[in-house]
Amino acid sequence: MIRLTVLYNLKPEVDEAEFLEWRLTDHQKANSSMPGVVHTDFSLNTLAWPKDTQPRYRFMTTAEWPNMKLFEEAFYEPNFQIELKNGVEKMLEDYTFLIGEILADHNEIT
């Protein structure tokens, strides 16, 4: 399983309420409909460690694909890369994109 993790902050001129409205509707649908995506989520980071420190990144998005081939086909598709670059340049200022292979996983239904 391949996981894309994007940690980011918005540019000061980006209205957070408007961003969240878009991010939780149109953009969430776009993320979940990317070819091969089996899971995606979006979070607001409110706590960090050590205790009483502020999170470096306000937002985090993850998306998962079953294998590297499907990830690369979707993520590195030229039109998607253009859209991604434009979106990042327009809205984000401090960001990190991490691509990792999941080596261990545990899910518990409570």
Indicate residue ranges for each PLM-predicted region:
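Macromolecular interaction modules
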Residues: 1-110
